[in-house]
Every structure is written in structure tokens, then in C-alpha cells.
Amino acid sequence: MRATPSQVWRWGAQAISLAACVLVWHVLSTQQAHLGLVTFANVPPPAEVWDAAWELVGSPKLSQHLSSSLLRVASGFVSASVLGVGLGLLIGRSRWARLALLAPLEVVRPIPAVAWIPLAILMIPSSEGSMVFITFVGALFPILLNTIHGVNGVDPRLVASARSLGTSPWRLFGQVILPSAAPSIVTGLSIGMGTCWFCLVTAEMISGQYGIGYYTWESYTVQAYANIIVGMLVIGLLGMGSSALIHWGGQRLMPWHRTQGGQA
């Protein structure tokens, strides 16, 4: 499909924005600038990071790093999606579930992923399982809260109309509640996927020999500064791409929402 002029303009603007960021990074790092409390004296310039990236691409460990991280993120995300959406639908529709579950979940929600590391090691003997658990915790609450928000945001007039027409509870859920809450659920899934990658470095600090987060942390310990930025950029690109894929799939599964939003 041919790109429209507005899409070309948008892509061009984004490319210019990225180029400007790289240019600023180059100037600050090569000049070893000091901006108040922030110094760029030890920040490698883009050219050095580019060389480190090419070195990683040519390394046989790249596939092992990527496959390990992708498996951990996928396992944590799928588990969080099943539990988060299920609990969110239950809490959103059931007053008793809300009273019983929401308060404990709200207490646990602000705890950062790094604080779960000691407990994850104690609860889960497998280091691989512990790493998956950290990514699971990171993704769970964005998915859960967005699902609850989506269910609570269903127009009560739609529910009342469906009930007045004799719609059964299961059909009411499948034909009114779930489609109305779906856009918010997809948003939660997209945010949750991004949070999974955000927690990856924390998760792979536990143990392991492979993974993009482990590669980033190991680069810091050996003071390979360019490799740190390479790892950060890889995590950022993978997180952005996977979140965009979820958003794209959600739009294709929700033609009613896409039409209302005016986007294809």
C-alpha cells in the first residue's frame, strides 16, 4: 500500500528528530561537555557505539543473548497477560472480587522490580524461573489496571439495553463488556510489554550467562561503556517493536475502535 503524504511527512519528521538527537549526543560526547551536575566526559560518541554494535552483530553470542531475553520476556508477558486480563475482568465486574482482591494488589503494585529479586530467589529455586518472575511482575499491573479501567468504562446504557433485550450474562460479557473494554486492554498489553523489557536488566542481574540485559550489566562491570549503550538501544528497539506489534494487532482485531479513532 502506497504511503500517504501525511504518513511520509510524519516519518520524515521522526527521522529528523532521531538525527537531531544523535547529533546532540555526538557534540556533547566529543566535546566532553559538563552541564551542571551532568558530565559527558565518559559517554562514548555515536561512532564508537556503532563500532561496538557491529562487533556484537558479528559475535556468535548475539543469537544466544537475543533468544534468552526473548524467551524470558515472552514467558513473563504471556503469564502476566493471562492473569492480568482475567483478574481485571473479574474485579471490574464483581463487587466482591474488588473488595477481596483490589486492596492487596494495590499494596503490592508500587514495589519496584528490583525489590522482588531476594524474594524471587527464595521462592523459585531455578534462576531462569526467577528471571521470568521479575518480568511477569513488571507486566502484570499495567495489564491488570488497564483491564479494570476498561471494564469500569463500559457505558452502562449499553449494559442496560442488552439486559432489557433478554441477553444472557455470558452473551452480555462477550458482546458488550469485552468489546467495549478491548481498547483499554490492548493499551495495557502494550504498556505491559514495554515494562517487561524495562525489567529485563533487573531480571538478568539475578544470574545467567546470556541475555541482552545481562550483556548490558556485564558491560558496566567491565567498564565497556560503548557496549552499555548498545545493550540499552537493543532493549529499547525490541521493546518499541514488540509494543507496536501488539498495538497493530489490537487495531486489526478491533475494527469498531479503529473506525471511531479515524486510523487504519
Task: Please place each PLM-identified region on the residue numbering.
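Hydrophobic alpha-helical transmembrane segments of polytopic membrane proteins
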Residues: G213-G250
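Transmembrane alpha-helices
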Residues: F133, V137, P169-T202, V230, ...
